[in-house]
């Protein structure tokens, strides 16, 4: 990472020159709008032309923490931070989020172009990060028809169940193998992330492992570990406030090193994904495949109104990667944080265990059809989503016209960031917001649902750009936590009375991976072999 004062001064000088010329040109073409009499949302003092770029390039890292600290200092739920010619609008209020994502959904239904999203979508070929337009509409139709429909959800039930079984098998095998020891320590971060990766690979490719997996076949091998770690690397850089996102012509400098990191991670993901796609395409073209078995097959056989393939090979590869990115993050992060909080609060863990024993019993494992009756377990998941979101912001929205939000002027082209952590930890919305308390979700709801319409929690967002995989994501996360709770008794590692639940400074993951002692609590015949 470059840390040279002369280089930074040189870059800022170039930036000033370029932005001066651009602003003069912009003034010639700017239309007069009545909304321009309104003020922008409150924000920090900014430099002429370059705005607050020096702040995000300097010591205010990570930028998302600086933004939330700034909003707290300004005592505002909506702010405006100018980065070169771009107005970045963070929001930490569910009321304002509803205005943006529901009332003015059409105004904010597109996405900005960023370095990270360009890489992960292979040049904007996918549904989640693609700006509004014909390509987005096409990909949305395909994903809605072949991935997120009720029929597809049921089609993938067995694959999801197989991986929930494998999770229990993986942990139990380690317990049996080490039965002579006084305790068995499980790397829960590894377990829950690989569960999510396994489900993604099983639904997409029909496989659990790229290679042989671990020695006993239930755990990940080096290939799966690299695959999932690379997916998480891409996720943490999707909107990382890279300089090139606001000054594209400086992208060649890669000042923060973001592009190198993302390109390497995407290369690793493609190294594993693309050969499977190429092989499957060949099987369909050679007539060896007759019936679809997974999401990849569904993409390949999708046809347009003329009977021609809807998706190109490159579009298939891009959408496969995006769906994997969307599958691995929320379930694993919520489960790791949820387990850590519940191990530290045995009374909460005990209530969840008692609910599962009452609804399911102890002679079989939890299955998805049990989930509607496991409200307390689902409340634990929802509380993990609220208090410990996987990312500080949703993917950015961009305003397609000048508009007014909460009485403030929002210029066309603004990047609007709905804050998951800001809303989930907002003391005006939640009593004792930093306390893990599943009961708060049971007082007014007879049925707990992660996708909250009031947007007091931002889990799957809302509107045209809301997450399309709500059913899959919810089922995966509920099953993951339920199986961990039902199958094993969990304690901190020896010598520790509590789990360290410190949050990483650079992101919202646990600062240290979760390790805990697992002891099987069911009869041996219940565990998959």
Swiss-Prot record:
Extract the SUPFAM superfamilies matched here.
Answer: Cytochrome P450 (SSF48264)
**Topological relation to the membrane, as annotated:** Single-pass membrane protein
Domain of life from the UniProt record: Eukaryota
Q: Which GO terms describe its molecular function?
A: heme binding; iron ion binding; L-phenylalanine N-monooxygenase activity
Stated EC number for the protein is 1.14.14.40
What does this protein need as cofactor?
A: heme
InterPro entries per the UniProt record, alphabetical: Cyt_P450, Cyt_P450_CS, Cyt_P450_E_grp-I, Cyt_P450_sf
Keywords annotated in UniProt: Endoplasmic reticulum, Heme, Iron, Membrane, Metal-binding, Monooxygenase, Oxidoreductase, Transmembrane, Transmembrane helix
Magnesium found in the keyword field: no
Q: Which reaction does it catalyse?
A: L-phenylalanine + 2 reduced [NADPH--hemoprotein reductase] + 2 O2 = (E)-phenylacetaldehyde oxime + 2 oxidized [NADPH--hemoprotein reductase] + CO2 + 3 H2O + 2 H(+)
Q: Which CDD domains match?
A: CYP79
Q: Does the keyword section mention Cell membrane?
A: no
Ranges that cross the membrane: 1-21
> Which GO cellular component terms, listed alphabetically, does the Swiss-Prot or TrEMBL entry include?
endoplasmic reticulum membrane
State any GO BP term from the record: secondary metabolite biosynthetic process
| EC primary class | oxidoreductase
The record's subcellular location field reads:
Endoplasmic reticulum membrane
Q: Which residues bind heme?
A: 467
Family, according to the entry, reads as follows: Belongs to the cytochrome P450 family.
The job of this chain, per UniProt, is described as: Converts L-phenylalanine into phenylacetaldoxime, the precursor of benzylglucosinolate (glucotropeolin).
Q: What is this protein called?
A: Phenylalanine N-monooxygenase
Q: What is the lineage of its organism?
A: Eukaryota, Viridiplantae, Streptophyta, Embryophyta, Tracheophyta
Q: Which gene name belongs to this protein?
A: CYP79A2
């Amino acid at each position: 990472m470059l840390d040279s004062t002369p280089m930074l001064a040189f870059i800022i000088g170039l930036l000033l020159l370029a932005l001066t010329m651009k602003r003069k040109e912009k003034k010639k073409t700017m239309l007069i709008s009545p909304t321009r009499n309104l003020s922008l949302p409150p924000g920090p003092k900014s430099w002429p032309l370059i705005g607050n770029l020096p702040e995000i390039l300097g010591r205010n890292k990570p930028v998302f923490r600086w933004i939330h600290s700034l909003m707290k200092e300004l005592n505002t739920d909506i702010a405006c931070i100018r980065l070169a010619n771009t107005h970045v609008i963070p929001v930490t209020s569910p009321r304002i989020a509803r205005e943006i994502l529901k009332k003015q959904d059409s105004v904010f239904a597109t996405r900005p172009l960023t370095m990270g999203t360009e890489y992960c979508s292979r040049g904007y070929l996918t549904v989640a990060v693609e700006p509004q337009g014909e390509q987005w509409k096409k990909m949305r139709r395909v994903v809605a028809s072949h991935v997120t429909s009720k029929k597809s959800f049921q089609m993938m039930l067995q694959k999801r169940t197989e991986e929930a079984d494998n999770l229990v098998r993986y942990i139990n095998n380690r317990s049996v193998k080490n039965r002579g020891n006084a305790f068995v320590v499980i790397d829960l971060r590894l377990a829950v992330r690989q569960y999510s990766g396994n489900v993604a690979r099983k639904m997409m490719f029909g496989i659990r492992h790229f290679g042989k997996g671990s020695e006993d076949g239930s755990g990940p091998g080096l290939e799966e570990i690299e695959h999932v770690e690379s997916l998480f690397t891409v996720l943490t850089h999707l909107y990382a406030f890279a300089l090139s996102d606001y000054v594209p012509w400086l992208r060649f400098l890669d000042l923060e090193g973001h592009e190198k990191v993302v390109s390497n991670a995407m290369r690793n993901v493609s190294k594993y994904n693309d050969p499977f796609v190429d092989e499957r395409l060949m099987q369909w073209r050679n007539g060896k495949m007759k019936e679809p078995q997974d999401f990849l097959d569904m993409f390949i056989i999708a046809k347009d109104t003329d009977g021609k393939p809807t998706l190109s090979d490159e579009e298939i590869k891009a959408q496969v990667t995006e769906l994997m990115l969307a599958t691995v993050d929320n379930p694993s992060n919520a489960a790791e944080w949820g387990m850590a909080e519940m191990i530290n609060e045995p009374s909460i863990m005990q209530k969840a265990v008692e609910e599962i024993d009452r609804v399911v019993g102890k002679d079989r494992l939890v299955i998805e059809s049990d989930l509607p009756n496991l409200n307390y377990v689902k409340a634990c998941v929802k509380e993990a989503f609220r208090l410990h979101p996987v990312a500080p912001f949703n993917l950015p929205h961009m305003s397609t016209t000048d508009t007014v939000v909460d009485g403030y002027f929002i210029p066309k082209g603004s990047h609007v960031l709905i804050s998951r952590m800001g809303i989930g930890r907002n003391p005006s919305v939640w009593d004792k917001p930093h306390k893990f308390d599943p009961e708060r979700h049971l007082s007014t709801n007879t049925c707990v649902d992660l996708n909250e319409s009031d947007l007091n929690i931002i889990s799957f967002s809302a509107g045209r750009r809301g997450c399309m995989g709500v059913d899959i994501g919810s089922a995966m996360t509920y099953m993951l936590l339920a199986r961990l709770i039902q199958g094993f008794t969990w304690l901190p590692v020896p010598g520790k009375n509590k789990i360290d639940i410190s949050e990483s400074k650079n992101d919202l993951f646990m600062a240290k991976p979760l390790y805990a002692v697992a002891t099987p609590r069911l009869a041996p015949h219940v565990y998959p072999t």
